[in-house]
């Protein structure tokens, strides 16, 4: 089970990289999708969690972006998200937030 989860965590970003972008906007969503692939390990595919972890797909982009910034700064309490958020820039937060907000 752990190996299949690890495989999915690496396979999805690689597949997303292989997708051609139809326009600049689509390219940004693809990059946002690639960046948000690590979210799927806890939040489920496309941000739809099957368990107790919050669903993040379809949330307002500004809400997601602010939450990520607050996790990174420590303003918002977390067990795991603070550590994950430290690895991303504000630009990457915006791409992730826009991608997840588009997953309605």
What do the PLM-derived regions correspond to, one by one?
Residues 73-76, 86-104:
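C-terminal capping alpha-helices of c-type cytochrome domains
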